Amino acid sequence: MLATVYLDGKKLKRIRTLKGKTQRALSTESSVSTSTIWLLETREKNERFHPPTLTKLARALEVEPTDLVGGE
């Protein structure tokens, strides 16, 4: 059986705040809209996300994409 991989909203928010970035700053640096970042952070498990979005956010936060995901 395959594991379900999801973008973890809690991890995203925790890393963003630890890096001292606002949602707006992360949006500017990643080219991901503020509303998308807000939606991702307010949902604990985001099973429907675009891999390029994950990559953009990880680069802007200077972390590996795997740091932003969870799985079951």
Please name every model-derived segment.
Residues 1-18:
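A short, Lys/Arg-rich alpha-helix, primarily the initiator
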Residues 13, 24, 55:
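Residues within the helices of the helix-turn-helix
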Residues 13, 38-39, 69:
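Key DNA-contacting residues within the recognition helix of helix-turn-helix
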Residues 16, 27, 58:
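The alpha-helix within a helix-turn-helix
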Residues 20-40, 44:
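Short alpha-helical DNA-recognition segment
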Residues 44-59:
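Short, basic-rich loop-to-helix N-cap that marks the start of a DNA-contacting helix
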Residues 62-72:
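Short C-terminal boundary/hinge segments that cap the last helix of small helical domains
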